[in-house]
Amino acid sequence: MKLWGGRFKEEESKLMEDFNSSLSFDKKLYYEDIRGSIAHVKMLANQNIIKEEEKEKILLGLEEILKEIDEGILKIEGDYEDIHSFVEINLINKIGNVGKKLHTGRSRNDQVALDMKLYAKKSTEEVIECLKELMDSLIKVGNENNYIMPGYTHLQRAQVVTFRYHLLAYFEMFKRDEKRLKNALEILNESPLGSGALAGSTYSIDREYTAKLLGFRKPVDNFLDGVSDRDYIIELISKFSIIMMHLSRLSEELILWSSSEFRFIQIGDAYSTGSSIMPQKKNPDGAELIRGKTGRVYGDLIGILTVMKSLPLAYNKDMQEDKEPFFDAKDTVISCLKVMEGIISTLKVNKENLMKSVKKGFLNATEAADYLVNKGMAFRDAHKVIGEIVIYCEDKNSAIEDLSLEELKQFSDLFCEDIYGFIDYKSSINKGIKKEMGYS
């Protein structure tokens, strides 16, 4: 049974049926589809479009279908065009001809737009929860490991920071991601139900009622836009892509830090894998997969942008292609956030190796220049002097703080005994606004 066909003389080919069917993936929307139908039926009865007893029969049938799906009694499979057909046909089979009144005053165009908005809202809230869990772990692990470490520019050691402060930089990124998602939720929080195919309905549909019942702020203002809007899907996948970019950056650093060349951290066994030939290997595959899956979400974004780029108003079947990219991007970002939270919460930090790396990198060179500025030298001149000292230290395989005062005075008479306290790593990180890094 199809939900259409009266104006056709010939049967749809089996090839076209298979090509046209979306049940294999839009079955994910069964809960949202039934929830939307329940709201629609209640509104129809309130508006005296269907009778009260008809409403009760339809609601009972819908609730039974939902229960049977949840319990695995009713499998979402078979020769159905989509999830909407599956629900409606099973409803008619269950309660009889009264089930045919379910679709009164509604099109699959506003129905699927509603389903996707409801699913997008729920999915975004799930992503936000995963972000919060990761942010909590970043704070916790940072507070437990507030050790001095090198900060980098161009992947070259630059200045002293702390492990905690470094993790907090990612906390800020994910906090912005959370704000972006919440903003997207506010924008999409308008119900398309009641828009019909594209031009509303001749029935006195109460769109405000269904919008409120389904948790939306208001109904959409324009029917055409209501059924053809997929901006929110593009926007959400775009925001998921930014989250993945942040996760990929963090993954890259964890991969580097866990390598034998750095040895800053150890990634827990639970989030590592081994080699089939090299017994000694412990590979950071969790972080590497997150880094790799970033491109997958970017691909989902490009895919949906390309689908929508030339579509005239209003609904077009091309829009069926919005679902798989969104489902994939949502599932990917959630799994990556969960794995990253696991990696962060179980990693071990090597305090000694962090400090060794600090001492090898002339990370107090800027502070040494600031010292000379405080003694009256212009910064550009101080910059040149310290650069010459660095060359001298490299030739001697020494650090600035290991030079004698006599050696330092070869470069400037402004150096005094207090230079050593000024460029001490633990002391310098608590000077000026560096105190905001919170090292103690």
Swiss-Prot record:
One Gene Ontology molecular-function label: argininosuccinate lyase activity
The keyword Amino-acid biosynthesis belongs to this UniProt entry's keyword annotation: yes
PROSITE patterns membership: FUMARATE_LYASES
GO aspect biological process, one term: arginine biosynthetic process via ornithine
Subcellular location field: Cytoplasm
Keywords on record: Amino-acid biosynthesis, Arginine biosynthesis, Cytoplasm, Lyase
Bilayer-crossing regions: none
Enzyme type, top EC level: lyase
Any one GO CC term of the record: cytosol
Cross-referenced PANTHER family: ARGININOSUCCINATE LYASE (PTHR43814:SF1)
CDD domains for this protein: Argininosuccinate_lyase
Main location: cytoplasm
Organism: Clostridium botulinum (strain Okra / Type B1)
Record field: catalytic activity: 2-(N(omega)-L-arginino)succinate = fumarate + L-arginine
EC number: 4.3.2.1
Domain of life: Bacteria
Pathway(s) annotated for this protein in UniProt: Amino-acid biosynthesis; L-arginine biosynthesis; L-arginine from L-ornithine and carbamoyl phosphate: step 3/3
Taxonomic lineage: Bacteria, Bacillati, Bacillota, Clostridia, Eubacteriales
Family to which this protein belongs: Belongs to the lyase 1 family. Argininosuccinate lyase subfamily.
NCBIfam families (alphabetical): argH
Name of one Pfam family that matches: Lyase_1
Paired cysteines (S-S): none
Coiled-coil spans in chain: none
Name under which the protein is recorded: Argininosuccinate lyase
